[in-house]
């Protein structure tokens, strides 16, 4: 029936947050715990989850979600959790706790062995989905600040499930033509919605390039295009901006996003606000990059702040007209090698709601000037 019905504005998407209890503000949006709980409760056929690692038992709310998944699997609901081969540290414990859940490890880059599965998303019954920066860990569900999107619009869920099928084809145990050649470029009907054909103003973007498939948009192309076309404002809330790519222990300069930010500030007078994370998961280059942006654009309208509580939110807003939510840092290694799916929207309401989140975070007591 989809071809004969118009898509609702925003494809029925709602923003989803995890806020640690020690923050000085609360969220008006669905929590990640509530989102995952709803997906499990409403599931009738299947629940598919993609995450770099799986450690839900590390917090009470994470354990509650895993127990709900266990109950669903015991009722006959098919549950598959995709993990990166290098993120399976807790796999044995989880399998013994719930043998009915199918855990599959993937290696999206057997040829060079540098790419990881970074994608953080859930799909159920081709009807509901979550995509964002909350991995399937207790921290992401309870104690680390994250941002994502939940939709119960079936066409969008179906489109995200196609990405799950792509990653699943890179099963690290089984051999297939996909993981033998590290290429999924010929996957049929790999996406229905993209930058030239959004649904309700919403579309997904993908990375890395060798996993694109037919008609998918490369995430870095869309992000850089939006940065380069910005006219008035760019707001970025990210764990890290790192203009390098690491291969075999060596670092190589990857200035694409970094230069696009500088050009927007200096050449076009765009107002830029950058809110970066500052915790132990940061790349060593992250703060140096933030400081260099601040120094290079000292005579321009570019401001940098540091968020002092664990913050894995990865958010980009351009001209108050476009929002991008992802699981990857603005990091050359992530964009060149790792596998993930990002959420994009030009829907006015979704952009406005994301902007309010950024403004709240920017003025909060947890955001400190880089110069302090």
Swiss-Prot record:
An annotated Gene Ontology molecular function: hydrolase activity
GO cellular component, one term: membrane
Residue span, PLD phosphodiesterase domain: 307-334
Span(s) of short sequence motif YPPL: 153-156
SMART domains in UniProt: PLDc
GO biological process, one term: viral budding via host ESCRT complex
Post-translational modifications: Palmitoylated. Attachment of the palmitate moiety is essential for correct intracellular targeting and protein function.
Lipidation (S-palmitoyl cysteine): 185-186
Membrane topology, from the record: Lipid-anchor
Domain remarks: Late-budding domains (L domains) are short sequence motifs essential for viral particle budding. They recruit proteins of the host ESCRT machinery (Endosomal Sorting Complex Required for Transport) or ESCRT-associated proteins. F13 contains one L domain: a YPPL motif, which might interact with PDCD6IP/AIP1.
Function as written in the Swiss-Prot or TrEMBL entry: Major envelope protein that plays a role in the biogenesis of the viral double membrane and in egress of virus from the host cell. Produces the wrapped form of virus that is required for cell-to-cell spread. Acts as a lipase with broad specificity including phospholipase C, phospholipase A, and triacylglycerol lipase activities.
Similarity section: Belongs to the orthopoxvirus OPG057 family.
Protein name: Envelope phospholipase OPG057
Organism: Variola virus (isolate Human/India/Ind3/1967)
């Amino acid at each position: 029936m989809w071809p004969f019905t118009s898509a609702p504005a925003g494809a029925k998407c709602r923003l989803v947050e995890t806020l640690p209890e020690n923050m000085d503000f609360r969220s008006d949006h669905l929590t990640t715990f509530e989102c995952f709980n709803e997906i499990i409760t409403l599931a009738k056929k299947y629940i598919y989850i993609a995450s770099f690692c799986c450690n839900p038992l590390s917090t009470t709310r994470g354990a509650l979600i895993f127990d709900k998944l266990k109950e669903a699997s015991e009722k006959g609901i098919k549950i598959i959790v995709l993990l990166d081969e290098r993120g399976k540290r807790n796999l044995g414990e989880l399998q013994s706790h719930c043998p009915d859940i199918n855990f599959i490890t993937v290696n999206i880059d057997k040829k060079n062995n540098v790419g990881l599965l970074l994608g953080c998303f859930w799909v159920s019954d081709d009807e509901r989905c979550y995509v964002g920066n909350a991995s399937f860990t207790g921290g992401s569900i309870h104690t680390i600040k994250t941002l994502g999107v939940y939709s119960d619009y079936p066409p969008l869920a179906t489109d995200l499930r196609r990405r799950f099928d792509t990653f699943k084809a890179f099963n690290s145990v089984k051999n297939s033509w996909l993981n033998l050649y590290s290429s999924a470029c010929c996957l049929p009907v790999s996406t229905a919605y993209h930058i030239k054909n959004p649904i309700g103003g919403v579309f997904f973007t993908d990375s890395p390039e060798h996993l694109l498939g037919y008609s998918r948009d490369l995430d870095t192309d869309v992000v850089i295009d939006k940065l380069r076309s910005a006219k008035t404002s760019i707001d970025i809330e990210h764990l890290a901006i790192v203009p390098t790519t690491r291969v075999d222990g060596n670092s190589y300069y990857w200035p694409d996003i970094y230069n696009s930010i500088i050009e927007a500030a200096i050449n076009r007078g765009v107002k830029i606000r950058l809110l970066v994370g500052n915790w132990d998961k940061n790349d060593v280059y992250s703060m140096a990059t933030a400081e260099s942006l601040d120094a290079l654009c000292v005579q321009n309208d570019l401001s940098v702040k540091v968020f002092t509580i664990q913050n894995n939110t990865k958010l980009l807003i351009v001209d108050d007209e476009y929002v991008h939510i992802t699981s990857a840092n603005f990091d050359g290694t992530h964009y060149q090698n790792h596998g993930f799916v990002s959420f994009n929207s030009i829907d006015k309401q979704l952009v406005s709601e994301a902007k309010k989140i950024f403004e709240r975070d920017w003025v909060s007591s947890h955001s400190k000037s880089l110069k302090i």
